[in-house]
């Protein structure tokens, strides 16, 4: 069943777009904090500005707010990147996230990490742009929580 859900979720996210009028009163940090509180990432570490720019290709000038968390445990997938882009900067942020995804695929050492990275998609919801690399046991729940939080 989880495999079927993953296939269905992947097909939903192909094209990466939803209505451009989707928005939320929450910040990207607040959305990510709620996902982290739900324990969807084991031993999460928050990524700060310098590292976000250098390692995660994020131009801080393009964003209103962002949150990046990565697991400190290996092996195993555990990465969430949620960005609330400034108006007119969604495509730039999405392009940055595509670079992150390519890096994650290239850096994947364990088969489970590689599979998760290869099946991941970038989601765009209004000004929110997100990338989740989570194990299949929690991915659908985390994405549902994200969607519930980012839509009014």
Predicted regions and their residues:
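A short acidic-to-branched-hydrophobic micro-motif
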Residues: 76-87
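Short, compositionally biased low-complexity segments enriched in polar/charged residues
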Residues: 44-75, 118
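An anionic, turn-rich surface loop/hairpin at beta-sheet edges
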Residues: 97-122
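C-terminal motif of bacterial Sec signal peptides marking the signal peptidase cleavage site
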Residues: 11-15
């Amino acid at each position: 069943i989880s495999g079927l859900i993953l296939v269905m979720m992947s097909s939903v996210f192909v094209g990466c777009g939803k209505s451009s009028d989707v928005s939320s009163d929450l910040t990207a940090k607040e959305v990510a904090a709620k996902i982290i509180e739900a324990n969807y990432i084991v031993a999460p570490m928050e990524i700060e500005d310098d590292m976000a720019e250098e390692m995660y290709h994020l131009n801080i000038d393009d964003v209103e707010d962002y949150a990046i968390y990565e697991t400190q445990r290996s092996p195993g997938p555990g990465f969430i990147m949620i960005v609330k882009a400034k108006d007119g900067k969604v495509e730039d942020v999405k392009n940055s996230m595509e670079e992150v995804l390519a890096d994650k695929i290239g850096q994947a050492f364990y088969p489970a990490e590689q599979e998760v990275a290869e099946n991941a998609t970038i989601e765009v919801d209004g000004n929110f742009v997100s990338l989740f690399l989570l194990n299949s046991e929690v991915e659908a729940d985390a994405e549902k929580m994200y969607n519930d939080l980012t839509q009014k």
